[in-house]
Amino acid sequence: GLLPKVKLVPEQISFILSTRENR
């Protein structure tokens, strides 16, 4: 999905990647 235009911190990126893998 499209991510909002915000500054994501490493923790946010890691969380997103994990969510994508779960999907």
From Swiss-Prot:
Its EC number is 3.1.1.32, 3.1.1.5. It is found in: Secreted. It is an enzyme of class 3 (hydrolase). Pathway: Phospholipid metabolism. GO terms for molecular function: lysophospholipase activity; phospholipase A1 activity. Signal peptide: none annotated. GO terms for biological process: killing of cells of another organism; lipid catabolic process. Keywords: Allergen, Cytolysis, Disulfide bond, Hemolysis, Hydrolase, Lipid degradation, Lipid metabolism, Secreted. Catalyzes the hydrolysis of glycerophospholipids such as phosphatidylcholine (1,2-diacyl-sn-glycero-3-phosphocholine) and has a moderate activity to hydrolyze lysoglycerophospholipids such as lysophosphatidylcholine (1-acyl-sn-glycero-3-phosphocholine), but is unable to hydrolyze sphingomyelin. Liberates the fatty acid from the sn-1 position of 1,2-diacyl-sn-glycero-3-phosphocholine mainly, indicating phospholipase activity of the A1 type. In addition to acting as an allergen, it possesses a moderate hemolytic activity on red blood cells of mice (3% of hemolysis at 3.0 ug/ml). Belongs to the AB hydrolase superfamily. Lipase family. This is Phospholipase A1 verutoxin-1. It comes from Vespa velutina. The lineage of its organism: Eukaryota, Metazoa, Ecdysozoa, Arthropoda, Hexapoda.
